[in-house]
């Protein structure tokens, strides 16, 4: 079916007739002889639009957008799912650390060196690693782990032992000497410092004690106290030997003007008394006297008793 060339001019007229309420513009139509062709073309246009309408931009947007009834917000991933997906992506990236297995000989050497020296220099670590056929990093890591273990052990066990020591070391009988000791017995969690504090064992306390010792020695251990009259020779002389001398001195004092015969008689009396005393002491000091007393006691009869 042929369409006249006036059809393009008649199309705006048809559109204008449909929306004449919105636009009251005057409509200009072609001649009357072209009117039937215009009606045919206008009748065919809706048919072609219904059969194959051209897709517009709005139609494309509607087709791409999801239907709210079928999938309401279900296709959009949440933040939790995103984080889980990221973690799953990162898990295979992590590398598991290979744990070094030391032999018994290596452990013995390392422990011995750690007991003597806890911190090694770079050169010492390199020498030790060469001796043990280990890498520098392995030796360094082992020493770091061992230091942490020792500190943890001291932190867990040191307070218990220190409390027991302080309780057992109490000495109430000597408060003047041990009062500073209890104050200086402190707990050391790190284990690097000595147990005794500098305040308790400083030079001032020791100097005071030495001064006290000197004063004690000067007052009590001097020679004057020991060299008394009780330790002289007169105290050790027996009264038996002094009897004659005393009698002689008494005779000399009370008879200054006596004649010579009286003096000789006094000397003889003093000498005889001295000899008698010496003989009696010698007689009683011999073992024969002891035997006599024993025999006499054994031979005594009940009648005599």
From Swiss-Prot:
Matching Gene3D superfamilies: Homeodomain-like (1.10.10.60)
Protein name: Homeobox protein NANOG
GO molecular function, one term: RNA polymerase II transcription regulatory region sequence-specific DNA binding
Binding region for DNA: 95-154
Phenotype for residue 148 to A: No effect on POU5F1 promoter DNA-binding. Increased protein stability
Residue ranges of Sequence repeats: 196-200, 201-205, 206-210, 216-220, 221-225, 226-230, 231-235, 236-240
Note: Exists an other tandem duplicated non-processed pseudogene (NANOGP1) and 10 other NANOG-related nucleotide sequences located on different chromosomes, all of which are processed pseudogenes lacking introns (NANOGP2 to NANOGP11); except NANOGP8 which is a retrogene.
Species assigned in the record: Homo sapiens (Human)
Subunit structure: Interacts with SMAD1. Interacts with SALL4. Interacts with ZNF281/ZFP281. Interacts with PCGF1. Interacts with ESRRB; reciprocally modulates their transcriptional activities. Interacts with NSD2.
Comp. bias intervals (Basic and acidic residues): 83-92
Impact after mutating residue 147 to A: Inhibits POU5F1 promoter DNA-binding
Region (8 X repeats starting with a Trp in each unit): 196-240
Single GO biological process annotation from the record: regulation of gene expression
Annotated region (Sufficient for strong transactivation activity), positions in chain: 241-305
Tissue expr: Expressed in testicular carcinoma and derived germ cell tumors (at protein level). Expressed in fetal gonads, ovary and testis. Also expressed in ovary teratocarcinoma cell line and testicular embryonic carcinoma. Not expressed in many somatic organs and oocytes.
Gene this chain is encoded by: NANOG
PROSITE patterns: HOMEOBOX_1, HOMEOBOX_2
Effect the entry attributes to changing residue 124 to A: Decreased POU5F1 promoter DNA-binding and protein stability
Biased composition (Polar residues): 65-81
Effect of residue 151 to A: Decreased POU5F1 promoter DNA-binding and protein stability
Region of interest called Sufficient for transactivation activity, as start-end residue ranges on this chain: 196-240
